[in-house]
Amino acid sequence: RYKTTPEKYEKILASDSVFEHRTDIGWIRDTATLGRELSERLVRLRSADRTAGNRYVSQTYYETYDQWSPNPCFDGEKPYYDLSNPDYGYRLLTVFRFWNMVEYFFPSKYLTDKDWNDVLPEYIRRMAHPTGSYLRETRRMIAELDDNHAQYGGGIFELFGRYRVPLNTGFVEVRLIVVTPDTVPVKSERKAPFQVGDEIVAVEDKPVEYYMAQTREFISCSNENDVLAATADQILRTKENRPISIRYRRDGVTRDTLADVTKMPGHFGWNYLWKYHKTF
């Protein structure tokens, strides 16, 4: 048993100065769906006296901008490290875990392009009848947050490839431009002819716009410039260790060439992206 103090929490919730946004938990009173007994337990639990702290969620702190910021830590959730391709049940668990974490602990959920209430039914359908791998669907769901800090650290090689043309590029408006020579070494007898200012027009006979559309839904960024910067990094990736064809334009003349690729190290990813890739 636990002590409840409903008057304490109702008073807090009634103050407009405390909460700018409130989570709708009216569903706990839905006796038709939940049954009367479960509904009553949830209503009672809502007002439970939590003087000893929350048994499900704790706070962890990290240093940012010279101050310590709290983050929720979901101690009671099992990680399931060994599930590389989980079944239907675990896929749905992923959806509900992530959606609820955002629903109850993410203050910027009201700023996403898509209504967060629409995300849950959409990804229940996606995970129940997946059109892509578990990894692809998970990254797509995370990208719905439109937040640079919401990143799935693993799987970038599975989605976009471990090999990459060693060339730094960035978008100038909607054109992909060679920015600087790459600092990543590559062993090759074929020297790519690119110069700063060259426009990349197509990769493997597919226009740059094709890759922009393909990668956009997997990239979580808060503004268009960062989306384009992340896209610039993915366009020159491939899953095969072989030269790839690139069409580029210089001084109004379009040329075709083959460019060698290099294998990215295991840690290679977003840190490199934000350090070297710029969008103008």
Predicted regions mapped to residue ranges:
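Flexible, low-complexity junctional segments that flank or bridge functional domains
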Residues: R1-F280
